[in-house]
Amino acid sequence: MKVRIKFSKEGPVKFVGHLDTMRYFQKAIRRANLPVAFSGGYSPHMIMSFAAPLGVGTESLGEYFDLELVETIPTSEITRRLDEVMVEGVHVISTRQVEDGKAGKAMSLVAAADYYVEFRPGKEPEISWRDKINDFLAQPEIKVMKKTKRSEKEIDIRPFIYKMELQGDKIFMMLASASANYTKPELVTDTFFSWLGVELPEFAYTIKRLEVYADKGNEEEHKFVTLEALGEEVE
């Protein structure tokens, strides 16, 4: 049985890195007494994979990992067992069964993610910026310097900003998140304010990831669906 588990990560645990989060869930799965499948060979390990690493210091309401079990268990039972052993700040939201070959691996499916960007108290720029987002997006190109392993290169990130708008006091954005075009919300935020002539101070804002999506569309039109929606509940 292959399942996709959705969880949130808020509060102080946002400072726990990706590898430590993986290790934490491995221990939690044991405490939850789930019949997890292991790989073969001299060094067997749990068959699990996370969808998209979350940056240190970023909260999230929509994180995912896939897990192989050797028995079929109701998905609601898996959610309950895991959530009961979570630390404060981590909440298991749902479990869905996914089929190999149909839904694919969570990591390879990731195409987009959406975020909230919110200024910390007293850190919001004093200039008028709220009505400038549409003008920013109206540019045919948004060129930035992006670091690679060996150097820097100029790229156009405009095609990777699928949506950006003001929602209340927060900036909402949906960005490309596939490995080939992964676009950080920090990069978009800093580029926007730099375009306005403002250099934001360090730690001026917080970021919360809201959801992660696969793209079931084609080259002409995107059709984003949540990774959760690609699975189904099992009674």
Task: List PLM regions with ranges.
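Extended, well-folded interaction surfaces typified by the phenylalanyl-tRNA synthetase beta subunit core
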Residues: 6-12, 16, 20
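Short beta-strand-to-loop capping motifs
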Residues: 7-9, 67-73, 117-123, 173-177
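Short Lys/Arg-rich amphipathic alpha-helical segments
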Residues: 12, 22, 31, 35-40
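Short, charge-patterned binding micro-sites
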Residues: 38-69
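Ordered, amphipathic secondary-structure segments that act as subunit-interaction surfaces
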Residues: 61-116
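Short amphipathic alpha-helices in soluble, non-transmembrane regions
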Residues: 78-86, 128-137, 188
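Core RNA-modification/binding signature centered on pseudouridine synthases
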Residues: 138-235
